[in-house]
């Protein structure tokens, strides 16, 4: 009789669940923080602890990359395009919220 791999499946599902939870907790910056970073455009100095020395950075996604080639591939990806679209959109204001409810 073949050996069951239920322990492996359980381990795998736990890893996936923990990975998703960690991504939710320590995910990318909020949109308003990203907009502030883009407006300030601070120069990033060399940091040996960051990938690529901190030179290849995507502001919208808050990610560092090893080379410029990898950064360009990332900028062509769908997750980056979605995030960039979110950043470009105008944020809702209190006035918009009141209008939607019908207070004004």
UniProtKB/Swiss-Prot annotation:
**Mind listing the GO molecular function terms for this protein?**
zinc ion binding
What's any one GO cellular component for it? Answer: nucleus
Query: What subcellular locations does the record give?
Result: Nucleus; Cytoplasm
Which keywords are on file for this protein? Cytoplasm, Metal-binding, Nucleus, Ribosome biogenesis, Zinc, Zinc-finger
Q: Which PROSITE patterns match?
A: ZINC_FINGER_C2H2_1 (PS00028), ZINC_FINGER_C2H2_2 (PS50157)
Q: Does the record bear Translocase in its keywords? A: no
InterPro entries reported in the protein's UniProt record = C2H2-ZF_Maturation_Protein, Znf_C2H2_jaz, Znf_C2H2_sf, Znf_C2H2_type
Write one Pfam family the protein is assigned to: zf-C2H2_jaz
Q: What is its main location?
A: nucleus
Q: Where are the zinc fingers (C2H2-type)?
A: 56-80
Question: Which GO terms are recorded in the biological process aspect for this UniProt protein?
Answer: ribosome biogenesis
Assembly and interaction partners: Associates with pre-60S ribosomal particles; released from the pre-60S particle very early in the cytoplasm.
Q: Which family does it belong to?
A: Belongs to the ZNF593/BUD20 C2H2-type zinc-finger protein family.
Extract the PANTHER family matched here: ZINC FINGER PROTEIN 593
Role description: Involved in pre-60S ribosomal particles maturation by promoting the nuclear export of the 60S ribosome.
This chain belongs to which protein, by name? Zinc finger C2H2 protein ECU02_0310
List the lineage, top down. Eukaryota, Fungi, Fungi incertae sedis, Microsporidia, Unikaryonidae
